[in-house]
Amino acid sequence: MSAIAPGLVLLAYLCGSISSAILVCRLAGLPDPRDSGSGNPGATNVLRIGGKGAAVAVLIFDVLKGMLPVWGAWALGLTPFWLGLVAIAACVGHIWPVFFHFRGGKGVATAFGAIAPIGLDLTGVMAGTWLLTILLSGYSSLGAIVSALIAPFYVWWFKPQYTFPVSMLSCLILLRHHDNIQRLWRRQESKIWTRMKKKKAPEQK
């Protein structure tokens, strides 16, 4: 177990470092998401620059690269401490990917995937919080921020032994959203629906 656990942490980081947003955009002939739209290689930005199909592919891949390493670690009987490190490593890989010059995304979908193996009840309330916030506000970033803030409390209620690692994940996500938080405070953040409409407008002319 002593050799398996660190190996899984490293594997999780390498899995997280596979940037699906960049790869999907390359395969679809789309601009590099790091240099287009919001500049973030994630599903929301791919939705803006490439449409729903590409965005769904990125979202699924990003969730799975967080979920599968944690699920594997759980199946091998790793303790909550090591499960937490595996989850954090997957998100760190997504945020600072070794394969893409350490220019990655914000880790929201990957963190959601990493938390999912804890339980369907937790997964459901997390997804509901994220979706409801976006539907009510129109801000994708606010959905991520609210979910990250409330996630440790949800985990403490459902599976308290995972509260600390999930809190670390939340801190990572909040740190990656510091620019979004400032724009939201200044009321300068763009709503996801507004950006999609702007993209469609030239196509309709």
UniProtKB/Swiss-Prot annotation:
Pathway: Lipid metabolism; phospholipid metabolism. One of its GO terms (cellular component) is plasma membrane. The chain crosses the membrane at residues 4-24, 80-100, 107-127, 130-150, 155-175. GO terms for biological process: phospholipid biosynthetic process. It holds the Pfam family G3P_acyltransf. Keywords: Cell inner membrane, Cell membrane, Lipid biosynthesis, Lipid metabolism, Membrane, Phospholipid biosynthesis, Phospholipid metabolism, Transferase, Transmembrane, Transmembrane helix. It comes from the Bacteria. It is found in: Cell inner membrane. It is an enzyme of class 2 (transferase). It is a multi-pass membrane protein. Its main location: membrane. The keyword Transcription does not apply. InterPro entries: G3P_acylTferase_PlsY. Coiled coil: none annotated. NCBIfam families: glycerol-3-phosphate 1-O-acyltransferase PlsY. Belongs to the PlsY family. This is Glycerol-3-phosphate acyltransferase. The lineage of its organism: Bacteria, Pseudomonadati, Pseudomonadota, Gammaproteobacteria, Enterobacterales. The gene is plsY.
